[in-house]
Amino acid sequence: MAKKALVNKANRKPKFAVRAYTRCQRCGRPHAVYRKFGLCRVCLRDMAHKGELPGVHKSSW
């Protein structure tokens, strides 16, 4: 319940613009969020492995 409240709080427009921060759209994690995808590193990796993100694949060399 606390996480939902924090997600709702992050979605509101803050009084000052510098107080705004990004959260993962999938799980609500506040750290390590990629702006391009709107996902945290954990969800990004998970979705990339499942093939749910078009154009993203694991590189190997």
UniProtKB/Swiss-Prot annotation:
Positions of Zn(2+) binding: C24, C27, C40, C43
Cofactor binding, note field: Binds 1 zinc ion per subunit.
GO cellular component: a single term: cytoplasm
Coiled coil: none
Cofactor(s) annotated in UniProt: Zn(2+)
Entry-linked PROSITE patterns: RIBOSOMAL_S14
MF-aspect GO terms: rRNA binding; structural constituent of ribosome; zinc ion binding
InterPro entries, sorted: Ribosomal_uS14, Ribosomal_uS14_bact, Ribosomal_uS14_CS, Ribosomal_uS14_sf
Keywords: Metal-binding, Ribonucleoprotein, Ribosomal protein, RNA-binding, rRNA-binding, Zinc
GO biological process: translation
Protein family per UniProt: Belongs to the universal ribosomal protein uS14 family. Zinc-binding uS14 subfamily.
NCBIfam families the UniProt entry points to: PRK08061.1
Quaternary state and interactors: Part of the 30S ribosomal subunit. Contacts proteins S3 and S10.
Role played: Binds 16S rRNA, required for the assembly of 30S particles and may also be responsible for determining the conformation of the 16S rRNA at the A site.
Protein's recorded name: Small ribosomal subunit protein uS14B
Organism: Nocardia farcinica (strain IFM 10152)
Gene that this polypeptide is encoded by: rpsZ
